[in-house]
Amino acid sequence: MKQKYLTFLCFYLIFNIAIFSQIVNEGTLQIEPSTTVYFGDEYTNKSAATHNNDGDLYLNNNFINNGITTSVSGTTSFKSSVNAIQTISGTANTANFYNLEVDNTLMGVSITDSFGLFVENAVSLTAGDLRLVGEAQLIQVNNIPNSGSGKLLRDQQGVSTTTAYNFWSSPVNNSGTFSLNGGLFDGTDAIINSFTPQQVLFNSGSPYNGVPATVVGGNVTTPLTISTQWLYTNPAASGWNSINQSTGLAPGEGYIMKGTGAANQNFVFKGTPNNGNYSFTIASAQSLLIGNPYPSALDSWQFITDNLGVFDQIEFWVDGGSPSHYTADYLGGYAIRNLTTGVAPSVISSIDGLGGASGTIPERHIAVGQSFIVEATGAGTSIVFNNAQRTFITEGSGASVFYKNSSSKITKEVNSFIRIGYEDPEGFHRQLALGFLPNSPADMKYNRGYDAIMSGPREDELFYIIENDLTKKYVIQGVGAFEDAVEFPLGLIIEEEGVHTIMLDAVENFDKNVYLKDVVLDTIYNLSTANFIPNLPTGEYLDRFKLVFKPKEEMLVVDDVVLEKTINVYYNKNNSIIINKPSELKLNNVLIFNMLGQQLVKVTANLLSESQISIPFQFKKGMYLVLIESEEGKKTYKIVN
C-alpha cells in the first residue's frame, strides 16, 4: 500500500480540520486560538520547522519533534482508543505545550529517555498514564493543580545493597500525599513492562534485609521487597522518626530506605505529578530532611537563593560501602553544596569512586527523587519549593547527580575552582573547595551562601579560616575575581600520629600554580607538582599555613629582619649545630626542620643566658632550617651539614 504524507511548508489552521495521513511539518505550522485540529497518524516537526499550537490539537498517534515548538494558549491532547502507547520523542530532546491532556483509553503516552516535556499550564491525565522513561522529565511553569485519574510514572535508581541507605523524595502524590504502599513500584522489568510495574512488597523481620525481584523470561513474577526496619523521615522538630509503608508524606518530604541486594535496582514512582509551591516550617538550629518534589531536576542555586534567609547550604548523604546494619559499621559522609560549588564527603580514599575530586561532588542540579539535609542557620522559618526552581538537566549530562555507588561526571563551570585534598592517617580524604566568582557578591569576608561549614568534622582536619573566626571550620570559600597576591588562611588539627597529606585534588578553569605557605618557616611548597606531608607533633595549627598563588624568588626564603641582635648559626665537624648569640638575648625555643617542613629537633632547656649553644645533630647530609624564637621575635637560618 502506498504511504500517504501531508507536508506543511507554511500553514495556518483556523478551521476545524481532521487529517488522516502521516504528517510532516517542514516550515511553520500555526494553529490559531479557537481552532480544533485532529491528526490521525504520526506527526513529525522537522529540524528546521516551527510548531505553534494555540488552539486544540488532538493527536491519535506519535509526536516527533526535531524542531521548535511554542505555545501561549490551547491544549495538546493525546487521544486514542486504538494506539495503546503513543510516544513523544525527537532529536530536539524537548517539546513545549501550553496545556497537556492524556486521553488514551488503553495505556497512555510514553516520553522517550532524556527528553524534556515543558508544559506552561495544566497537565490533565484524563485517561491513561504519562510514562517518563529513564531520565525523561516533566517541567511545568504555572502553579496549578494537575488532575485526572491517570498517573505519571518515573524511574530512579539508588544504592542497591541491603545495608546502605538511599535518601529519597517522591515526584508524585496520590490524593495529596505519597506513601510507599501505593506510590512505589518495582522497575526491574521496566523496559518490557513500562506501564505496568508491580507494587513493591515489604517485610519487617530478621535479618531485616530487602530482597530483589524474582524474574522469569525478563518479567517480574515476584516483586522486590523492602525492609520497613530502615524507613525513616527527619522532621525538623522530631529528629529521625520511624515510618512504615503506609505513612503519608507531603510533597518534598524526604525519607530514607535501604536497598534490595540486586546488582542494579530500578524503582518506579507512580501517581499524580507534583507541581507548584510546597513549604516547610523550621526553627533556628533545627535540621530537616527534604528533597526535590518534582518530576524534573531542581536548580540548587535558585533553591538556596530563594531560601537564603533560612539556610545557606545543603548536604547529601553518600554511602561508602557500609558492610552491615550496625551503626558503627556505616561508611560514608555528607557531600555539601552551596552557591559557590560542591565538595565530596570525607570518606576513606580507597573506596572506589569516593573521596576524590571526581567522586561525589554535588552538581548544581538535584536529580529527580533525591533528598538532602538542610539546617536552619538564619532568621527565616519557612522553606519554599516553587516551579521557578525547576529545570531540565539529566544525570547523564553530568550536571545532576542521584547518589549511588558510581562516580558522577564533572561538568565545567564558567567560574574558577581549586580543590585541595587532605588525608589523615586512617585514610579519610577531606576536600576543600575555593571558588573565584568574579560576577558574584562574594569577597574575602564571610559571605552567607558562598562559604560552607564542614559537616561531621573528624579529629584530624584541614579547613579554611575566614575573618579569623577560629570557631568555624569551612570547607567551601567563595571569593571574587582571582588575585595572585591574596592568601587564604588554613587551619590544621593533628590528633593522631602518622602520615598526614595535603594535596591538590583538582583545578577547574584555572591555569596557575597552587602553593602551600608555612608561615613559621617562611617556606612555600608547590602543590601543583607534589603533595605536602607535614611531620608535626599533635596539636592545633591555626596560624601556620596559607594557600597562596605567588611564589617567592626561591622556594625557601630566610627572614633577616625580625631579630636585630646578631646571631650566628653554623654546623661544625663534631656533628653539632652551634648558635652564637649575645648573652643578654634570651631564647625561648630552637626548632630544626628538614626541607619538607618536618620537625626533627626541639630545644627549650639551657637557652636563657648562654652565649653559645651546642645542639647534637646527626642526620643525613643535606640542607636544614633552624628556627630561633626569642623575646624579640623569631628568625630562620639555613645550614648544611
Explain the meaning of each model-derived region.
Residues 234-250, 256-610, 617-621, 630, ...:
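Compositionally biased Ser/Thr/Gly- and acidic/asparagine-rich
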Residues 3, 11, 79-81, 595:
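Generic beta-structure capping elements
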Residues 12-15, 19, 82, 101, ...:
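Prokaryotic Sec-type signal peptides and long signal-anchor helices
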Residues 18, 83, 112, 562-564:
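Residue-level signal for pocket-adjacent positions within structured domains
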Residues 1-26, 557-559, 636:
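Bacterial Sec-dependent N-terminal signal peptides
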